[in-house]
Amino acid sequence: MTTTITITRPDDWHLHLRDGAALSAVLPDSARRFGRAIVMPNLRPPVTTTALAYAYRERIMQAMPAGSGFEPLMTLYLTDNTSAEEIDRAKASGIVHGVKLYPAGATTNSDSGVTNIGHCVKALEAMEKHGIPLLVHAEVTDVDVDVFDRERVFIERNMVPLLERFQGLRVVFEHITTKDAANFVAGAPENVAATITAHHLLMNRNAMFNGGIRPHHYCLPVLKREEHRLALVAAATSGNPKFFLGTDSAPHAKSAKEAACGCAGMYTAHAGIELYTEVFDAAGSLDRLEAFASFHGPDFYRLPRNTDKITLEKTAWEVPASLPFAGDELVPLRAGSHISWRLKD
């Protein structure tokens, strides 16, 4: 008899949907699995204003599969010049649910990011007043800091002073990758939470070098040592409401990944909930999947939980070698290999 599990429809609290033809290619994967998603603002040009967020949301809605109830939750891209008035407009809009902090140069399309947190004081004060979460890509970008230490150094250098200065600011430590981050969030006040990706739960840094360079396993923050992966699994399966699902699914064309200077990011939306189910199954914690995937996120964001359900069955299926993507190809995680859980229609 096939093993099945039925849970409240999950949400994705960290998603890259891109734009144009790329948006149309990837949106159906997320819309099939999730009720809502926090949509990242790192387009070219970035979504820096509420007006741009409205326009981007409209493009997403126009690309939505027929009959889908998926809801995009918009975000703004924080810059050195973001004003308190813009945060006021974001709050009044009802469509903006967070503001993303990218240290300049930290990841894809982050060139417009924050150069010094001190430049953002007025915006952060307004966010604190309105209860709008700050979503932090928590890595320093100094060339003299080892890429595997960027997250740990950011905690010491930036996150601790930020939380001391803005004690009422609600903060999501995005895509945590280290035991340092897991421990920090677990011990932080209740206004601090974290998202965890499926790929950081499933793989350690060996996956980038297994038999050769594996460009489709390169992401930012980069995969870390096994001790860190185990700490993330422990956090995700702990039942602690500070930790919740955020895929950080980041589609890039195959030609942009398999290159001399390839892009960072893994595409996981094709199996956005199935991969997490694998993790929780392997950890003997399927009974805690629903809280992590469906409850902790909306509770932190002060939104209602979804009311409909999805069912997954323990039936292996083979992931396609590639998917069509805006005139190119997109290589999904586990391309040509199997995933042990399947979402039932």
Swiss-Prot record:
Annotated residues for binding of Zn(2+) 1: H14, H16, K100, D248
Ligand binding (substrate): H16, L17, R18, N42, H137, L220, H252, A264
InterPro entries per UniProt: DHOdimr, Dihydroorotase_CS, Metal_Hydrolase
Source species, domain of life: Bacteria
Catalytic residues, chain numbering: D248
Modified residues (N6-carboxylysine): K100
Family matches, as Gene3D superfamilies: Metal-dependent hydrolases
Claim: Hydrolase is one of the keywords in the record: yes
GO cellular component, as recorded: cytosol
GO biological process: 'de novo' pyrimidine nucleobase biosynthetic process; 'de novo' UMP biosynthetic process
Keyword rRNA-binding attributed: no
Record EC number: 3.5.2.3
Catalytic activity annotation: (S)-dihydroorotate + H2O = N-carbamoyl-L-aspartate + H(+)
Keyword tags: Hydrolase, Metal-binding, Pyrimidine biosynthesis, Zinc
Entry binding sites for Zn(2+) 2: K100, H137, H175
Subunit and interaction comment: Homodimer.
Function: Catalyzes the reversible cyclization of carbamoyl aspartate to dihydroorotate.
HAMAP family (UniProt xref): PyrC_classII
Protein name per UniProt: Dihydroorotase
Organism annotation: Methylobacillus flagellatus (strain ATCC 51484 / DSM 6875 / VKM B-1610 / KT)
Higher taxonomy: Bacteria, Pseudomonadati, Pseudomonadota, Betaproteobacteria, Nitrosomonadales
